[in-house]
Each structure stands twice: as structure tokens, then as C-alpha cells.
Design a protein with these regions (language model features):
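Acetyl-CoA-dependent GNAT
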Residues: 6-11, 15-89, 100-102, 106, ...
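Conserved hydrophobic/aromatic "anchor" residues
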Residues: 32, 65, 90, 129, ...
Length: 160
């Protein structure tokens, strides 16, 4: 490695377990303010038989997590990425992208044909990430967040 190169940390993806709940809640509160899911909401999401959840680790740190659901819509399976959280100190290291791809791969394995998510309209870094991965804006959701900020629904086809 050259001296002026920055080593990109290795992101390890693993399934979320019930033992991770408190860490997920703490990370959710770090990442979001008024929109943060409560402990009960996170637990309920994780206990859903349709849930797919992964944790990202960098060294010993929990760097982030993703929770997604497989939903049925007009007889087709559709993935819903409910939340992607990346710890502040682990942003801009590929953690969000790694979590997004892990969720998409798992949704595809569960026969989801497409995936959608909601993102704050003012979250430019997330919007750039999703757009680069082929997500397109499909709906504007006015006053989606409790603070009155709109969300954008973005969708991506998972079928090749």
C-alpha cells in the first residue's frame, strides 16, 4: 500500500439477533432525531416473519444495520427497506452501500421482484447513493416525517 492511500475498512455483514436490540436502538437514536423508531417498533419489525435484518461491523464496532420486509402487492413479492442506519463515525466508508446490497440480495433470494424505500427529501447523500444504485423517485410524500419534512419514495427493479 502506498503511503498516501487510505485503507478502506472491511465491513462484515451478519444477521441481526435478538441480542443486538439495544445496540440497534442506540444507533437508531444516533442516526435519527424525531423520526427514530422506538425500541418496541424495532423489536416488532425484527419479530416479523417477513423481516430481513443485517448488522454491519467494522472491527469490533457496530457500524450500521438495515431492516427490510418482504411484502405482497397484487400477488407479487416486493421488498421494503424500512431503515438503513450507519453510525456517524462509519459514514463515507461504504457501509451504507454494503448494507443496501445485502438487503437487496436477501430480498431477491426471497423472490422479491422490486424494492422500495422512503428517504428524507433533504438527505442528499442518501439520495445520491440510491440513485447510483438504480433507484428512481416514484412518489413525493408530503409531511411524511413528524417535523413536516417530505419524503421521496424510491423504487428499484430487482429482476434482471
Amino acid at each position: 500500500m502506498k503511503t498516501n492511500e487510505i485503507r478502506k475498512p472491511k465491513v462484515i455483514i451478519e444477521p441481526v439477533t435478538s441480542h443486538d436490540l439495544q445496540n440497534l436502538v442506540a444507533l437508531e437514536r444516533e442516526c435519527f432525531t424525531t423520526e427514530a423508531y422506538t425500541e418496541r417498533q424495532i423489536r416488532d419489525l425484527l419479530e416479523s416473519p417477513n423481516a430481513i435484518a443485517f448488522l454491519a461491523r467494522i472491527d469490533a464496532d457496530i457500524a450500521g444495520f438495515v431492516i427490510s420486509l418482504v411484502e405482497e402487492y397484487e400477488g407479487a413479492k416486493i421488498g421494503h427497506i424500512v431503515t438503513i442506519d450507519v453510525a456517524i463515525k462509519h459514514r463515507r466508508k461504504g457501509t451504507g452501500l454494503t448494507l443496501l446490497k445485502a438487503a437487496e440480495d436477501a430480498l431477491l433470494e426471497r423472490k422479491a421482484r422490486a424494492v422500495y424505500l422512503e428517504v428524507r427529501a433533504d438527505n442528499t447523500s442518501a439520495l445520491q447513493l440510491y440513485s447510483k444504485q438504480g433507484y428512481v423517485k416514484t412518489e413525493i410524500l408530503e409531511n411524511y416525517y413528524s417535523c413536516g419534512i417530505r419524503a421521496l419514495r424510491m423504487t428499484r427493479n430487482l429482476e434482471s
